[in-house]
Design a protein with these regions (language model features):
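Conserved N-terminal phosphate-binding loop of PLP-dependent enzymes in the Aspartate aminotransferase
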Residues: 1-142
Length: 142
């Protein structure tokens, strides 16, 4: 009963504060702020559902050849974001925006700027990797 009451109170707040309407405007702003990323030579797709946006990086845009997972290109974007004070979510070579509902249009613009910079950095050079770079329990048999 207590959890249900809390859920109903949350729904009341969403209705009173017009959270869904505000999110529609913010998601539209997010789409506009990130639209230029679709033109990046290493971005296959920018996709969005509501307040969740994903940017998929690839080696070759025409063939949509993915980066090897071992290169962890998304992690490079994430690390750049942290250095700039932004939290982006990497999953392989896909970088996600998962902002809180209280984000402002200016903060969305900042996320788009940081993501663009991070993608430039992550896709600039070839990456040399070893399995031991990614798994702490990896033991070199040699």
């Amino acid at each position: 009963p207590l959890a249900c009451a809390a859920a109903l109170a949350t729904l009341d707040i969403f209705e009173e504060d017009k959270v869904i309407e505000a999110n529609r405007a913010l998601s539209t702003h997010m789409a506009r702020a990130t639209a230029h990323l679709a033109d990046h030579p290493h971005v296959a797709e920018v996709r969005q559902t509501g307040m969740v946006l994903a940017i998929e990086m690839v080696q070759d845009k025409a063939s949509r050849t993915p980066y090897p997972w071992q290169e962890r290109r998304g992690l490079k974007v994430f690390q750049h974001g942290l250095e700039r004070g932004a939290l982006l979510r990497p999953l392989g070579s896909v970088v996600y925006f998962l902002p809180p509902y209280v984000i402002t249009p200016e903060q969305i613009d900042f996320l788009a700027e940081v993501a663009s910079e991070g993608i430039d950095i992550a896709t600039r050079d070839a990456v040399s990797v070893a399995v031991s770079d990614f798994h702490p329990d990896h033991r070199d048999p040699g």
